[in-house]
Amino acid sequence: MPDSARLTAYSAVSTSLALHSDRRLGELVDAALPLGSGIGGRSALLEVGGKPVFVKRVPLTEVERLPEHARSTANLFGIPTFCQYGVGGGPGFGAWRELAVHTMTTNWVLGGEYEGVPLMYHWRVLPGTAALPEELADVERVVAYWGGSPDVRRRIDALQQSTASLALFLEYIPRTLDEWLTEQTEAGEEGADRACSLVERELEAGTSFMNARGLLHFDAHFQNILVDGRRLYFADYGLAISSRFDLAPSETGFFERHRTYDRCYTRSWLVNSLITKVYGYGREKREALIRACAAGEEPPDGPQKARAVLSRHAPLAAVMTDFYVKVQDEDRETPYPAEALHRALQADRTRRG
């Protein structure tokens, strides 16, 4: 059953927001406390009936606002599928896809199927948008990074010229998993062990649930996952892709090849994150330790559960980390190592018993 307090808040906040005119809602959003801006849009904190609400404003291009494209989950700009990896400042795949995923995930909570996602109370198209984020400001650099794609250029130009945004009014969960895991590992071995158990369990449960329903998050790093100390909440769906979207044939094939992506990505991120937080290693030493543990070496002294996680998932993390280094630093079209990761997942299950 869904949490009754969450449902009560949802009912009150969603009704209150729905009763505002576009003009009044725009005024409230403009007066909200700014939290930041980035490649996915601007964010702010709004209070509605004493309840904090996270507002994300996603740029909405003129192409997306055309009547024939309203609410479309198609890849309207023909963005190459390798931009799903989100490295190097990707152009994104459109606001309507993000809205569709929020609608899907909110219904999971309301239907009592799954609690580990933030609720969307309301959405609205509002006038006004922001300048291109820093990651996209150097258009020539971004286009060159993505192989000179004319579709990437067209998308960035459209973002630059947009005059409206999709405002998403979301449940506010203030702490990221990255922040929380840092706190827990610094609090001592007992706290670190409890945190490792919770995170490993919740990552598995969340990715399995989403993937079984045809949704790949594709950007579940630990600043896009929120935590309240009891469970994790998978947030920020700017790169999410669903088998229920209006996919091009190339996207359908890409989706099928990447069905293991979320599980591998989150486990690899956990390994890399623990090495950084427990041992203080930078990239070079971190990657060396992953390779050593993957080859069978014991991790250095540290919290027992953290060491167990490293030993268990290092072989998978070694494959995934190597793939990401190649995508980020060498070739955006590096083939996804699906077979090697499948074998690593099978071995993972064996090690867990």
Where are these regions (language model features)?
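Catalytic-loop of the protein kinase fold
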Residues: 212-222
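Conserved ATP-binding subdomain of kinase catalytic cores across diverse folds
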Residues: 28-168
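Conserved protein kinase catalytic core
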Residues: 62-63, 177, 225, 242-244
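Activation-loop N-terminal segment of eukaryotic-like protein kinases
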Residues: 227-230
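C-lobe/activation-segment region of protein kinase-like
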Residues: 233-344
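Juxta-kinase regulatory segment immediately upstream of eukaryotic protein kinase catalytic domains
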Residues: 1-36
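ATP-dependent phospho-/nucleotidyl transfer catalytic cores
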Residues: 126-213, 243-249, 253-256, 260, ...
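Short, glycine/acidic-enriched loop or turn micro-motifs at the edges of active sites
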Residues: 174, 222, 239
